[in-house]
Amino acid sequence: MLEILADESVGGNSPTVIINRGAKKMQWPFIGCGGLGFSKTAHFTCFDSMTQLCEEDIPCIHLPPQHRSVYKMSTENKMRAVVFHSPYKVAVEERPIPKIQDSGDIVVKVTYTALCGSDLHTFRGIEPAGTGFVMGHEVTGEVVEVGSGVKSIQKGDMVVSAFTTSCGECFYCKQGFSSRCEKSVLFGCDHLDGAQAEYVRIPNADGTVMKAPEGVEEKYLVLMADIFPTGYFAASNAFKGYTPEQISEQTVVLIGCGPVGLCALINALEFKPKHLLAVDSIPSRLELARSLGAEPWNFQQDREGLDKRVKELTNGRGADAVIEVVGLSPALRTGFDLLRPWGTISSVGVHNGEIPWAGNDAYDKNLRIQMGRCPVRSVSPQALDVLKKNQHKLGFMADKIMPLSQAVEGYELFNAMKVQKVIFKAGE
């Protein structure tokens, strides 16, 4: 917080302003927006990325470029962050910039941080959570601090972080199951502040982050923190155990065409199944699915037609695989009903309800199912290969880039499903 003092006798377009910072006083003329004579002490919340200071009764005061370094120095320990207070209530607040707490930590100056569908589980109160923590788990940025034990990352590196931390050394990490690392913590919860901020501390950095590759725009690289690898994980599990020849004859149903679902769609098409049906109830999402190469189906308008179409394509058997990304029991049940015996359900939706079928139903179908959180760090190399080939198709994911300062509006838009994805640009 800066204290700004102005002399009443000073007015016009170049008032002299004294910055009171501790025992030191610095004085220089500011370039104003006209007629700024005033006599008062005004308090401003300031951030190192801003070049102007604003207060409701002072329209606009611009900091001269030659003094910006002084201004940045005086605010270097504060940042903006999106803080969760209660269901449906987040706020952009000033917080201390995080510091190294453990030798394996790094601190990243955030470039892009995104809003994920699973953030809405917290926002809507579906998933129990405390309050007062920084939201978000999708982030890219520049490393500005490095713990003494970090081996693979240096200051100045551009990185993308997985949405959960992983050590890279435990049994699960070595098996390729980094999502169940023995030291795993989810960003954006009671235990670890998240990435919707101007800076973020990342524990276990060697096993958690990936250096930014060449040839990928950073606004798309942020998708590698969660949703694109999750889409890869969902698709690869659906086809696991099958040869390319077998996959080329398969009919696959994707349930859910939100951001994760469309990432799963792009990844599934890389495996080249014979038919890929995309199911949702929102016309704009279905149109995107069509443009990406799937056959769209609105289940609310024509559920019976969907059933008939799957049977028609499979000689009455049912789908060979179902990819479910919604996280609701009715969606999982729909997938089960559309599936043939010995078929596979790959589910990455975050489920809080009970499994919607009985044990004998699964037994009679010889059901194969893979559920759970994506091990982002483990599958990142394979997922990145797919993203590099397909980033030209991802424009719809980056058509709503907002300043971090407008995060409250971003949450409202995303919660109302008025946008496909929200990406926040930190420092704005």
Curated annotation (Swiss-Prot):
Processing after translation: Benzoylation at lys-393 by gcnE leads to the activation od adhB.
PROSITE patterns, per database record: ADH_ZINC
Catalyzed reactions: a primary alcohol + NAD(+) = an aldehyde + NADH + H(+); a secondary alcohol + NAD(+) = a ketone + NADH + H(+)
InterPro entries, alphabetized: ADH-like_C, ADH-like_N, ADH_Zn_CS, GroES-like_sf, NAD(P)-bd_dom_sf, PKS_ER
Observed phenotype of the null mutant: Leads to decreased conidiation and seed colonization, increased sclerotia formation and aflatoxin production, and increased sensitivity to cell wall damage stress.
SUPFAM superfamilies: GroES-like (SSF50129), NAD(P)-binding Rossmann-fold domains (SSF51735)
Top-rank taxon, per record: Eukaryota
EC number: 1.1.1.1
Leading EC class: oxidoreductase
Binding locations of Zn(2+) 2: C167, C170, C173, C181
Details of cofactor binding: Binds 2 Zn(2+) ions per subunit.
Keywords: Metal-binding, Oxidoreductase, Virulence, Zinc
Gene Ontology MF annotations: oxidoreductase activity; zinc ion binding
Positions where N6-benzoyllysine occurs in the chain: K393
Cofactor: Zn(2+)
Sequence positions that bind Zn(2+) 1: C116, H137
Pfam families: ADH_N, ADH_zinc_N
General function of this protein: Zinc-type alcohol dehydrogenase involved in development, secondary metabolism, pathogenicity, and stress response. Specifically controls the formation of sclerotia and the biosynthesis of aflatoxin. Contribute to seed colonization of A flavus on host maize seed.
Listed name of the protein: Zinc-type alcohol dehydrogenase B
Organism encoding this protein: Aspergillus flavus (strain ATCC 200026 / FGSC A1120 / IAM 13836 / NRRL 3357 / JCM 12722 / SRRC 167)
